[in-house]
């Protein structure tokens, strides 16, 4: 590390010895940084304990109604019991989860503790990554944010990929920062690699693992390359690309040889206009531009502020999207990125990496998706860049420092308060679920659907195929019975084409639930794709459909046998 780099880090951390500054009065931020530096281990372990405590208090022992979290469990189970490699949507997380499926089976609560462990690791490695590289006030603001924010903590008890990805991403940043620390511009191309070959090997391995854990992970290494391009470290660009490609090639060779070629085309699915309707075609260039800016408006003007602002409501409407706010926020981030370029290379790296990550999200996700979980992997870095930028702006003005710290403290207390309220609301459901009532907390429509899935597993032969609106959820609550999925329906279904399609899939039974379109309210509007398909069959061939079982009276779920 050069003398200039060491001086920059020392200045950035603001941890100068007070005795060396007797002639200079310490500011509020100086005093806070000095106190945090002296007590950083105590502060960190306290925050780590509280983070883990909130992970447990906010623990959600149910699967979500989205279905993706159940799908990851099903893929992990299929890998263990059927040797089917989980290529679709990234194999990294199902492969890691498969170790726990091997030990605990389909025990959802046990499997969710893997995410709790990932949250623990994410907080720990984030601290190690940024410690002594950024001001302590900024460091502990970041650790507090990822420890208490209820959106981030939500994924600490879900079998979505987010907590796992955040953990891996923190390791990737840690390795990259170690490489940045060790850069020696005077070394030759070969010598430079030899001096840090261990770090570069770990870099290649970790970034490939990140890339196979979430499709968007491929752009992460692009962020690293972009940073080295801006800082004119061209040899590091060569090392980064070669190491990533080498490990990616090795991964491809091993998986293809052991499990066969990947038949799921992630790029093709990414280009679809509608993810689950391939017949809708693919986006052209102008369509991709529209997608980018639609997602840009949605995620920056809506979801970022929902996640950052602890008093923002969880529910939202399309009218909450404010495009001008997205552009204002982007300008602010750009200004803070420019500031960090001159002040702190690790914040600057975070900004460049963030640009690459968000760019990939905005281009790679269909605009109608609108899920906040897609931006959650970028939120720690968004918070970091924003908080650091404000820190730099106020540090020369004592009055503004006081206002800044007061505002940050209030926001922290409100964030903790919001998570505490949610923990109290969660207490009854958590107690019931841990006590064995696996359906408590679901609305009647979902409870009846899941009970019907279990009935199918308990009462029907294993060889009989059952059609389900949410096959992965049926799989979990049906004790591992495989179900056939029906996510959409033809535009104008007719009896003969429906029967022909079901017969090709050997569908013998159909679960007909009344799942709400509005999860919060039973207003009579339901997700009716299976209803639209079974109705013409019933009208034309009434003798080919037989009611087998009904569960529930309100928002009931029915099971029909199809007689070909």
Which residue stretches match the model-derived regions?
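Hydrophobic, aromatic-rich transmembrane alpha-helices
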Residues: 123-126, 305-350, 356-358
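Perimembrane helix-loop-helix junctions
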Residues: 29-31, 181-182, 219-249, 253
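Membrane-lumen/periplasm interface segments of specific transmembrane helices
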Residues: 234-314, 320-329, 414-422
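Membrane-embedded, lumen/periplasm-facing catalytic core of multi-pass transferases
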Residues: 410-471
């Amino acid at each position: 590390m050069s003398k200039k780099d060491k001086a920059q880090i020392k200045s950035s951390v603001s941890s100068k010895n007070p005795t060396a500054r007797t002639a200079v009065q310490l500011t509020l931020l100086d005093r806070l940084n000095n106190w945090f530096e002296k007590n950083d281990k105590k502060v960190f372990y306290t925050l780590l304990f509280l983070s883990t405590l909130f992970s447990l208090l906010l623990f959600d022992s149910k699967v979500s109604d989205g279905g993706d979290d159940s799908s990851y469990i099903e893929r992990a189970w299929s890998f263990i019991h059927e040797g089917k490699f989980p290529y679709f949507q990234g194999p990294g997380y199902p492969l890691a989860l498969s170790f726990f499926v091997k030990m605990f089976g389909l025990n959802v609560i046990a499997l969710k503790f893997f995410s709790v462990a990932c949250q623990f690791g994410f907080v720990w490695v984030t601290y190690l990554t940024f410690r002594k590289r950024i001001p302590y006030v900024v460091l502990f603001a970041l650790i507090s944010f990822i420890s208490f924010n209820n959106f981030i903590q939500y994924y600490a008890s879900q079998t979505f990929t987010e907590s796992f990805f955040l953990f891996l991403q923190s390791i990737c940043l840690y390795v990259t920062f170690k490489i940045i620390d060790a850069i020696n511009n005077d070394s030759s191309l070969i010598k430079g690699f030899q001096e840090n070959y261990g770090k570069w090997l770990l870099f290649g391995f970790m970034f490939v693992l990140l890339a196979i854990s979430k499709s968007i992970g491929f752009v992460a290494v692009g962020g690293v390359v972009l940073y080295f391009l801006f800082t004119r470290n061209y040899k590091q660009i060569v090392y980064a690309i070669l190491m990533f490609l080498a490990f990616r090639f090795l991964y491809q060779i091993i998986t293809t040889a052991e499990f066969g070629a990947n038949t799921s085309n992630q790029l093709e699915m990414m280009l679809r206009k509608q993810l689950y309707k391939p017949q809708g075609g693919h986006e052209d260039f102008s369509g991709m531009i529209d997608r980018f800016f639609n997602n840009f408006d949605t995620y920056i003007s809506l979801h970022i502020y929902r996640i950052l602002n602890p008093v923002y409501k969880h529910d939202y409407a399309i009218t909450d999207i404010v495009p001008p706010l997205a552009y204002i926020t982007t300008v602010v981030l750009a200004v803070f990125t420019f500031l960090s370029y001159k002040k702190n290379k690790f914040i600057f790296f975070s900004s460049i990496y963030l640009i690459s990550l968000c760019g990939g999200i905005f281009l790679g996700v269909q605009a109608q998706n609108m899920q906040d979980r897609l931006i959650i992997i970028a939120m720690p870095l968004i918070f970091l860049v924003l908080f650091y930028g404000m820190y730099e702006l106020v540090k020369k003005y004592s009055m503004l420092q006081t206002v800044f710290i007061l505002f940050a403290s209030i926001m922290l207390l409100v964030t903790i308060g919001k998570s505490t309220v949610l923990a109290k609301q969660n207490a009854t459901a958590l107690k019931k679920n841990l006590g064995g009532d696996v359906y408590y907390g679901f609305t009647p429509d979902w409870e009846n659907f899941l009970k019907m899935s279990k009935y199918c597993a308990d009462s029907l032969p294993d060889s009989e195929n059952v059609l389900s609106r949410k096959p992965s959820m049926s799989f979990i609550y049906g004790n591992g019975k495989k179900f056939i999925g029906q996510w959409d329906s033809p535009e104008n279904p007719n009896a003969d084409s429906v029967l022909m399609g079901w017969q090709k899939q050997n569908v013998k039974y159909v679960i007909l639930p009344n799942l709400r379109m509005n999860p919060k309210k039973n207003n009579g509007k339901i997700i009716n794709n299976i209803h639209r398909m079974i109705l013409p069959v019933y009208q034309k061939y009434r003798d080919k459909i037989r009611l087998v079982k009904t569960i529930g009276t309100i928002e009931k779920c029915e099971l029909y046998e199809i007689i070909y």
